């Protein structure tokens, strides 16, 4: 049975719009895969994740450094994104101390979204059996990545509206538990 992808998104409180953008981006993927999204400050969830995403803005906040340490210690794949902004001295030091990461710079939220989606697609293409990616979905992902690399369409940047929190994105047909029903569903089972 396919496994839901467990992703941990580590970011300072000031990066809430960026974190929200990443959560929304997962729902855009053209594949039928379930996602479990955990986020700062849930340090205990880092060892259970399959993938660790780090977003660095102007400053670094606790416990982001500890979360990164746990991700490295438990050998998680790390996706690192750094906003193209001036950083505080602490933010500069954190970036320098972690220069070994494959940092992807982004200038705005649409650029972050594109970089993140490319990385997620590549991750899924490396592990198709584990996450239940079919041959057709793999080809669709390759086409999706090609579109991302060609287009640089802008998305409106706004304030966070709540989609950046932790959550679960269910894959219809793959994540349905027998006898389960939606909250608020009044039909009898």
Positions of the model-derived regions?
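C-terminal interaction surface of TIR/SEFIR-family domains
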Residues: 87-187
């Amino acid at each position: 049975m396919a496994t839901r992808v467990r992703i941990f998104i580590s970011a300072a409180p000031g990066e809430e719009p960026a974190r929200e953008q990443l959560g929304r981006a997962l729902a855009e993927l053209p594949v039928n895969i379930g996602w479990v999204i955990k986020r700062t400050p849930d340090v205990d969830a880092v060892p259970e994740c399959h993938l660790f995403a780090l977003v660095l803005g102007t400053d670094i906040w606790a416990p982001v450094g500890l979360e990164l340490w746990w991700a490295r210690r438990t050998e998680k794949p790390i996706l690192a994104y750094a906003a193209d902004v001036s950083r505080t001295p602490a933010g500069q030091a954190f970036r320098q101390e972690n220069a070994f990461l494959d940092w992807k710079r982004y200038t705005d939220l649409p650029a972050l979204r594109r970089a993140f989606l490319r990385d997620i697609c590549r991750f899924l293409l490396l592990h198709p059996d584990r996450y239940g990616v079919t041959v057709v979905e793999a080809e669709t992902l390759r086409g999706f990545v090609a579109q991302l690399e060609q287009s640089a369409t802008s998305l409106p940047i706004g304030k966070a509206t709540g989609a950046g929190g932790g959550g679960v994105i269910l894959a219809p047909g793959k994540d349905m538990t027998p006898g389960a029903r939606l909250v608020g569903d009044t039909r009898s089972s």
